[in-house]
């Protein structure tokens, strides 16, 4: 039992100490208190669940030395282990949270990268997005609306 506890502690500490990759576009343009990514591809929307049981998009606080775009990419890595590339700005919320459309490699699979913060990380298809268990009220409906609008938009 003691050996299993020591192995778990080593795994937690190793994941927390991993350095995020460099930002894909370190432009340092703009500022925001927080940012995140809406990663949507053939697998669905990438969501994280915290230990209270609530789902959310990967995201969090932006460091003083980084742009919102870089903060969004870093947060995806910290929470899911995936290397994301932030693209277009999807929306800025009233609280200043910047949400970007982000891509990850098609072969990459998410993993719980911060086990003290994240209880689960997975892909959800549009029809199966969980109802009523969101960190922020109305977030599930907002994600559906953003994805549907993007799918219906004419290609450039």
Question: Where would I find each of the regions flagged by the language model?
Answer:
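A short gly/proline-enriched turn/hairpin at secondary-structure junctions
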Residues: 56-60
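Short loop/turn segments immediately following the C-termini of beta-strands
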Residues: 50
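Acidic, metal-coordinating catalytic segment for phosphate/diphosphate chemistry
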Residues: 17-35
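Unchanged
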Residues: 61-142, 146-153
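Entry beta-strands of beta-propeller and related beta-repeat scaffolds
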Residues: 44-45
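Bacterial N-terminal signal peptides
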Residues: 5-14
């Amino acid at each position: 039992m003691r050996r299993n506890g020591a192995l778990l502690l080593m795994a937690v500490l190793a994941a927390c100490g991993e350095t995020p990759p460099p930002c894909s576009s370190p432009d340092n343009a703009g500022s925001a208190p927080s940012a995140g990514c809406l990663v949507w591809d053939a697998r669905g929307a990438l969501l994280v669940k915290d230990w209270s049981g609530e789902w959310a998009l990967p995201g969090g606080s932006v460091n003083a030395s980084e742009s919102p775009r870089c903060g969004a990419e870093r947060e995806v890595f910290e929470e899911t282990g995936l290397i994301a590339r932030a693209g277009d700005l999807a929306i800025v919320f009233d609280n200043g949270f910047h949400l970007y459309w982000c891509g990850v490699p098609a072969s990459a699979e998410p993993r719980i990268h911060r086990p003290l913060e994240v209880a689960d990380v997975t892909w959800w298809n549009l029809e199966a997005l969980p109802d009523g268990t969101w960190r922020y009220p109305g977030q599930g409906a907002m994600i559906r609306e953003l994805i549907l609008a993007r799918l219906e938009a004419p290609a450039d």
